[in-house]
Structure formats: structure tokens, C-alpha cells
Design a protein with these regions (language model features):
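Secondary-structure end/capping motifs
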Residues: 231-310
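Conserved C-terminal helix/tail region of periplasmic/extracytoplasmic solute-binding proteins
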Residues: 300-330
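Short, surface-exposed acidic
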Residues: 162-166, 266-279, 314-321
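Short, glycine-/small- and polar/acidic-enriched structural segments
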Residues: 25-171, 176, 180, 184-188
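Short, low-complexity disordered leader/linker segments with a strong preference
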Residues: 1-35, 62, 328-330
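Short polybasic/polar patches that bind polyanions
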Residues: 13, 55-56, 61, 100, ...
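Pocket-lining segment of extracytoplasmic ligand-binding domains
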Residues: 94-95, 174-177, 181-266
Length: 330
């Protein structure tokens, strides 16, 4: 969590004070589109499709907004949103929880995917079918404390010993390269890396987090903003979410067309991967929720309790301040 605070301090130092000149100008005339920005959490992928659909199909303009989609840089979306350098961002429940413990008031305003689709993936020849099979293997991660906590939690359900698992940092190494060379398994999001494996004809075994603990069925990713933005300009937040909701509803109902929109916006993406990933995600964006983006208090409480139990949080947060469904279309 110290890293989170350091990142925010750097952004604040760079940012200075006050609104950007663009936003000052954008608020000048009623008939002008209001300029706002949304920062991605990663390079563009199908988690982000609803944003690109809303942009391409004019949903943002219909709501009076001129939205710039920004790639994440050295400072991530959370830090930029917290510092007021971006109005919106893409985050995850874990990061927002950690930020609020540090007194940084960012808020989740919509769940992009209703359930956690991540898990531990391995080539079938590694014969890793359950957490018990992690013993004697090598896990490749990125060095975050949450990784060992999740691995331990899953292994405990089957009486396995975390000390018999070798955990290494694989950095930016590609999953498919790493599992052939350095590691036995890694933590992936099936909608992208899992679907890519299908296209490559490389069969995987998946150990999904949600198969072993309902407390690990947290929201990832989510759309975020700041408490300050909600307080000073709730109408813009409402307009943004109205357009984004239409974008994701379109992606749910028309995955092939939504994939074309993402490919047009980001031509460097693999068209086959985008198309198949979009098909896989379409029914999972909303899943069993009453509407896209909806969040539940118990999901926030469950994951906070799990993080506290594993020593990943210093104190509880008020989960009802960490998320809101207020800005979703009625």
C-alpha cells in the first residue's frame, strides 16, 4: 500500500492544483460537449469494449460528453482519478479497497464484469487440476502480496502446503513463453489469455478462484471516479454511466459488431482474439445481475473480510462509500 501512496504523491506533484484548461473551457457553453477522460487499466482489450462502442456509436455525444480514452502510463488510473487528472478510470475492487484504507476517496461506479473470471492456468501436460497439485510446482507472478495470500487460501482448502510451492516473479514475460520455459502455471483472465490459448490450440487446465471461495468472487474490473467528482458534478457522472451502460448492453447483445468496433479503434489487436473473446465475455458482463454494472454490498464485504483475514488490509472500510449503483440507468 506504500507503493499506492507514493504513486499518488507523484501524480499530485505533477498535477499541481485546479482543473485542466480543457475542462474549464468545456464548461463554458451549454451547447458544447463537456470534455472528460477515462483512463484504462491496461492495453485495450474486451474488458473495455463498452467504452469504445459508446464512443463510436455516439452515445457519449448524446449525453453531452466528449470522452477521451487514455492509456495507462507510469501513474495508473487510480492515481490519476484520485489526483483529479482524469474524471474516470478502470480499476479493480482490491485497489479501491486499499486506496480507501489510505484515505484516498475513489469510488466504484459500475462492475464491468459481474463475476471474477480469473484463475490459475497451466498447460494440461502439467497435470495441475486442483490447488493440491500446486505442490512441487513453480508459480509465475508479478510480486504482489495478494498472490501468495490467494494461493495459500486455495491450497488450504485441500490441505496443501504453500511452502512446497516455488513462487517466482515472471515480470512482463508472455504467459505462453513462460509456461514452456520457466514456470508451471500463472494467474490469468480467461476472457483474454484463456481464449488466446483456445485459438493457439494449447489446452489449459483452469483452477478458478470462485470454485474455492465465494469471498474471492470480487469485482474485476470496475469503473471508478472520485468522491469529489460525485459531489461537484453528479450530472456528468450520470451522463457518463448512461452512455457506458448503453455501450456494454450493445456488446452483450451484438458481440460480433462490438468486436468490429474495438478492432477499428485499436487495429493492432488480433482480430480473431478480439472476436472470440467478445463472444466469450458477452454473456458474462451482466450474467445474473438485474442490470449491467450493478454491484452488491455483500461482495464488497466478503472480499474486505478476506483481505483483513489475510493481513492485506490495516483496517476495515465503509463499503457503502466504496461503491455506488446510484449512477446506473434506472
Amino acid at each position: 500500500m506504500k507503493k499506492w501512496v507514493v504513486g499518488l504523491v507523484l501524480v499530485l506533484l505533477l498535477a499541481g492544483c485546479g482543473a485542466t484548461e480543457e475542462n474549464k473551457q468545456g464548461a463554458g457553453k451549454k451547447d458544447e460537449l463537456k470534455k472528460v477522460s477515462v483512463v484504462l487499466d491496461w492495453t485495450p482489450n474486451t474488458n473495455h469494449t463498452g467504452l469504445y462502442v459508446a464512443q463510436e456509436k455516439g452515445y457519449f455525444k448524446e449525453e453531452g460528453l466528449d470522452v477521451e480514452i487514455i492509456m495507462p502510463g507510469e501513474a495508473g488510473a487510480d492515481q490519476l482519478v484520485a489526483a483529479g487528472k482524469a474524471e474516470f478510470g478502470i480499476s479493480v475492487q482490491e485497489s479501491i479497497t486499499e486506496a480507501r484504507v489510505q484515505g484516498v476517496p475513489i469510488v466504484s461506479i459500475g462492475a464491468i464484469i459481474q463475476h471474477n473470471t480469473s484463475g490459475f492456468a497451466s498447460p494440461v501436460e502439467k497435470n495441475i487440476k486442483s490447488p493440491k497439485d500446486f505442490e512441487g510446482k513453480t508459480y509465475g507472478g508479478w510480486g504482489a502480496p495478494v498472490e501468495k495470500a490467494v494461493l495459500t487460501s486455495l491450497m488450504d482448502t485441500e490441505g496443501a502446503d504453500i511452502e512446497k510451492l516455488d513462487i517466482v516473479n515472471m515480470g512482463d514475460t508472455d504467459f505462453f513463453t513462460a509456461v514452456k520455459r520457466d514456470i508451471d502455471f500463472a494467474w490469468i483472465y480467461y476472457a483474454w489469455t484463456g481464449v488466446e490459448a483456445e485459438i493457439r490450440g494449447e489446452e489449459l487446465n483452469m483452477v478458478y478462484l470462485t470454485d474455492y471461495s465465494e469471498k474471492l468472487d470480487y469485482y474485476t474490473p470496475v469503473l471508478s471516479t472520485s468522491e469529489k467528482m460525485i459531489e461537484k458534478d453528479p450530472e456528468t457522472v450520470k451522463a457518463f454511466m448512461a452512455a457506458v451502460s448503453k455501450g456494454y448492453e450493445f456488446a452483450i447483445g451484438h458481440p460480433a459488431d462490438a468486436a468490429k468496433i474495438l478492432i477499428k479503434a485499436e487495429p493492432d489487436l488480433d482480430p480473431e482474439l478480439v472476436k472470440k473473446s467478445q463472444e466469450w465475455l458477452a454473456p458474462r458482463y451482466k450474467d445474473d445481475a438485474a442490470k449491467w454494472g450493478e454491484q452488491k454490498k455483500e461482495v464488497w464485504e466478503n472480499y474486505m473480510d478476506w483481505m483483513l483475514d489475510k493481513g492485506l488490509l490495516e483496517e476495515e472500510i465503509d463499503v457503502e462509500k466504496a461503491f455506488t449503483n446510484e449512477f446506473l440507468p434506472k
